Amino acid sequence: MGNKVVTFTEQELDDYQDCTFFTRKEILRVHKRFRELRPDLVPRQMTEGQASSVKVPCECIEKMPELRENPFRRRICEAFSRDGQGNLSFEDFLDALSVFSEQAPRDIKVFYAFKIYDFDQDGFIGHADLMSCLTTMTKNELSPEEHQQIADKVIEEADVDGDGKLSILEFEHVILRAPDFLSTFHIRI
């Protein structure tokens, strides 16, 4: 009795609860999942510094059952990693799962979906980004010509201002017409 391991202080849990869409219990569950990815690397009890500095390699995160079959798993890791390489600290991992939770609002989900599809990270989804998305989704099932036609059609239909690329507002307009966007942009912990 009395030998309970405390993962986070009360203040840390309050802070995490304030900046995510999770309850305290869910935050502790997220930490457990994070630790299971690399128990040799992630301490059972984390200090504030470790929560942002101990990073689990992207390759380990990509193997999670919830991401394993997702063709965008690497881009998801890169979009949430502070190092840009896809390696996630606990805080990065918590942010990612918070955005993919049912409680996250639509505008935050749209922002991160845009970030995932913006392969060149220029703040727009251009032709090259669409080609990368199509290649990621279809592998070699479509020809380069078919990829080209689809990318051209998306730009033609979604590019309201005619600049040849999609801004986040144009992307949001398109993505919100997809009836299953909110339900598919989701990871259950």
From Swiss-Prot:
This protein's UniProt keywords: Calcium, Cytoplasm, Magnesium, Metal-binding, Repeat
Molecular functions per Gene Ontology: calcium ion binding; magnesium ion binding
InterPro entries recorded: CIBP, EF-hand-dom_pair, EF_Hand_1_Ca_BS, EF_hand_dom
Record note on disruption phenotype: RNAi-mediated knockdown results in reduced photoresponse and impaired responses to flicker stimuli at high frequencies. Failure to sustain an adequate photoresponse during prolonged stimulation. No obvious eye dysmorphology when raised under 12 hr:12 hr light-dark conditions. Significant photoreceptor degeneration when raised under constant light for 5 days.
Subcellular location: Cytoplasm
SUPFAM superfamilies: EF-hand
Miscellaneous information on this protein: The binding of either calcium or magnesium significantly increases the structural stability of the protein in comparison to apo-CIB (calcium- and magnesium-free form).
Domain of life the protein comes from: Eukaryota
Main location: cytoplasm
Pfam families per UniProt: EF-hand_7
One cellular component (GO) term of this entry: cytoplasm
Binding annotation for Ca(2+) 1: 118, 120, 122, 129
Bilayer-crossing regions: none
Keyword Calcium: yes
Chain coiled-coil ranges: none
Subunit-level organization: Monomer. Homodimer.
CDD domains, alphabetized: EFh
A single BP term in Gene Ontology: calcium ion homeostasis
Keyword Calcium: yes
Name by which UniProt lists this protein: Calcium and integrin-binding family member 2
Binding site for Ca(2+) 2: 159, 161, 163, 165, 170
